[in-house]
Amino acid sequence: MNALHFGAGNIGRGFIGPLLLKSGFNLTFVDNNQAIVDAINRHQKYDITVVGNNFSYITTVKKVKAIYINDPNIYFKIAKINVITISVGVHAINSLVVFFEKLIRYKIETNDFVFLTIIACENVFRCASKLKENIKILLPGIYHKYLDKNISFVDSVVDKIVCPNDKNNSDDINLSVKVEKFSEWIVDCTQFKHDRPNIIGMIYSNHLDAFFERKLFTLNTGHAIAAYLGLLIGYKNIYQAILDPLIFNIVYGAMKESGMVLIRKYNFFTDSEHKNYILKILSRFKNIYLTDSLKRVGRNPLQKLKKDDRLISPLIDTIKYNLPNANLMKGIAAALCYIDEKDIEAKKLRNMIINKGIKYVLSKISSLDSSLLIISEISIYFNIFMKVNI
């Protein structure tokens, strides 16, 4: 069995790729970074350091190869693929539409009727379904029957904290990564048109929407708020931030607020189950050996402030269900304070706030009604955070 993984980044190398190899697939990474592609093909292996508060061990991933996405012979080289997984990031996912449209054409023209499963592993709601819709818009109608019959687009939720390992002193790309032991990969069991791939660690569910928002509203929400608050104080890593009692209380409070939304919205998680889930995530954040940079977690703040992302989406639902949201508002205010001259989105956000104000940003970027009282409340927290430490 052959598998491709698009995106030879942290999640690809540290989570999805190793599971595919462990499950018996021949794995090829596809990436738009020629240097990473060359490094993978040169070494054909890399190390994963698994760390916890009382353990650390190294595993070596072997027999890996990679191909540059703009290789002129890529469609020939990846023929007869059985499984494609994707973790390229929110901003890059749409760039794959043209690639997959051409791949489908190539499969038809070469009489390739091997069933293909495409699984999106992104922090985007129903990412694979959206990808399929966009491909169909581009793909001529005469090819739609082939797509619908032979290709499964499967949505999933992935959860594992993966960090780049320490840089080495050579000019070579350091492929090694550092990961936590915890992992979760849940896929929508209703979207497979043919036999499900036998992948170790994959969980099949028909409640994917609930699991997606559980992860987004809890891990991603808490992660982001811890990062933005930590940066205000001057911390560097997630574990430093979450060990600060004041930050911990706000993050824990925000997670409980978003948790009340999930319990009310889905009637699927119990209070005790979700409390344990929150506490498990907080313990993961406290892993002092997982040096997860606050700037890495906080990067691309405009994306994180969109209405369907980790900060605004749970806030909107607290309004809908008339639930508490003070800690979520504090987290959003901290995100608005984010400054990083190397982050294009952070610079845009800063300029928008200076020139247009908070109300404009939350209306334009977050699609919040400018008349909402919470905008004034977020503005108050923002002004406090900008003047003094928390």
From Swiss-Prot:
Residues in the signal sequence: none
Pfam families reported for this sequence: Mannitol_dh (PF01232), Mannitol_dh_C (PF08125)
Keywords: NAD, Oxidoreductase
Enzyme Commission designation: 1.1.1.17
GO biological process: mannitol catabolic process
Binding sites annotated in the UniProt record for NAD(+): A3, L4, H5, F6, G7, A8, G9, N10, I11, G12, R13, G14
GO molecular function: mannitol-1-phosphate 5-dehydrogenase activity
GO annotation, cellular component aspect: cytosol
Catalytic activity as recorded in UniProt: D-mannitol 1-phosphate + NAD(+) = beta-D-fructose 6-phosphate + NADH + H(+)
Protein family membership: Belongs to the mannitol dehydrogenase family.
Protein name: Mannitol-1-phosphate 5-dehydrogenase
Species annotation: Buchnera aphidicola subsp. Baizongia pistaciae (strain Bp)
